[in-house]
Amino acid sequence: MTTILKHLPVGQRIGIAFSGGLDTSAALLWMRQKGAVPYAYTANLGQPDEEDYDAIPRRAMEYGAENARLIDCRKQLVAEGIAAIQCGAFHNTTGGLTYFNTTPLGRAVTGTMLVAAMKEDGVNIWGDGSTYKGNDIERFYRYGLLTNAELQIYKPWLDTDFIDELGGRHEMSEFMIACGFDYKMSVEKAYSTDSNMLGATHEAKDLEYLNSSVKIVNPIMGVKFWDESVKIPAEEVTVRFEQGHPVALNGKTFSDDVEMMLEANRIGGRHGLGMSDQIENRIIEAKSRGIYEAPGMALLHIAYERLLTGIHNEDTIEQYHAHGRQLGRLLYQGRWFDSQALMLRDSLQRWVASQITGEVTLELRRGNDYSILNTVSENLTYKPERLTMEKGDSVFSPDDRIGQLTMRNLDITDTREKLFGYAKTGLLSSSAASGVPQVENLENKGQ
């Protein structure tokens, strides 16, 4: 059976991930007119720039959908976001600022929950608005087929008939008007935005050029912290975790993770926390650039890692970072539910996150400028009395340290011998002015 359909399957049910925007509206209407039977599915991901979710399915019905459903994905989205924080599943960083994989997390939830809803309705053909150059086409492909092995894919934007008739936004707008719908194109921005409750992605158009900075972006989850005319007073905030799960903000306990994430977004957003500019490597290994917002994820991540460093030992922390980066890349590639990702997630949540209990107090200022004011946990292995510089009882004596240093003589001797061995082979240079061989200055060798 062909998995990807190049042309419209006339007379068959097609599920379309319907956002209510111009692209999906025109595609749905076009498919109905050409003889397909479209079903519309809209994911409620708590998008900060969406005002009326209930109106979206109604519009889909007006445009010819056989049926239209609104699928509430918020709870699952937040659950996956918290899992990503527990695992440190983030691999794109620039200058210490992190991209929290908010779009990949959204695609994992959307791709599985919408296809599951389609399967309930007997719809086994799926279409969405992802383009052939991007990451989402592969993410949705993987998650869709994982959820429904019988799934076939039809994308209007890969259909030459659709492209020839409605290849641009102007053509789509004119098509809608000609069909009796008073559809006005939204004002063109200098970039495109995709968002969910965890974060927002701004990319494309002017942002494809690296001389266009964050200053052209209008944040939808925070403030323009770079604009000195925007007043942002400093604010203290406390974040409490229990066994790796965020449970309280500023002393208020949340039983609903969705409400907790919304409040974390409000707190972080007041300062522009979690906004970053990243050059990343797409799945197809071409580089792209995005400007990201994730105020709540950033707030929780900072507090989580503060507790992590005070609770776990060095080797555990090293494994957390290494496995987290690996898991973040799998998430980015659309492999969040693959066996290798599940193995890493289980290990990190079981042996790392389970011990993260405590409370962190921070002072948030402008953007990603913050200070940690206090860290409290019953699981802290940080014990100031162990290494105090003050006179008093100590867990080890000067003689103990002399013995420990003496034992280092063995590997110091081995290292010295290796260095002189490298010098003999020409990898290092040796001179009377230096006690050990050193790498030669390449400039002196004309290289």
From Swiss-Prot:
NCBIfam families: argG (TIGR00032), PRK05370.1 (NF003779). The lineage of its organism: Bacteria, Pseudomonadati, Pseudomonadota, Gammaproteobacteria, Enterobacterales. The keyword Transcription regulation does not apply. It comes from the Bacteria. Keywords: Amino-acid biosynthesis, Arginine biosynthesis, ATP-binding, Cytoplasm, Ligase, Nucleotide-binding. This is Argininosuccinate synthase. It catalyses: L-citrulline + L-aspartate + ATP = 2-(N(omega)-L-arginino)succinate + AMP + diphosphate + H(+). GO terms for biological process: argininosuccinate metabolic process; L-arginine biosynthetic process; urea cycle.
